[in-house]
Amino acid sequence: MMIVTTDRIDGYNVKAVKGYVKGSTVQTKHIGRDITAGLKGLVGGEIKGYSEMMDEARKLAIHRMAQDAEAKGANAVIGFRLQTSTVMANAAEIIAYGTAVEVEKE
């Protein structure tokens, strides 16, 4: 599955547009990460536990979007975007979305 942020893929033609696709996940903070975050807030620095959690959440959202695209018969996603929003005080939602297309080499 090719996934690009652009509206076209060099060397390929769009054969068919399959439609909007998305994948999402909501991740919550772990109590251990909250304690670490509180300490890091006092001294500064990267909160590695949160960075890792968000990276895994992005990967999961992208994977779910790719599954949605495959279910629609697509072999690529163009116009790919990621969006993060706070759902509640201790949870973040990651949404991956784009346009599913069927492409072929030029």
UniProtKB/Swiss-Prot annotation:
Pfam families: YbjQ_1. The lineage of its organism: Bacteria, Bacillati, Bacillota, Bacilli, Bacillales. InterPro entries: UPF0145_dom_sf, UPF0145_YbjQ-like. Belongs to the UPF0145 family. This is UPF0145 protein BH0643.
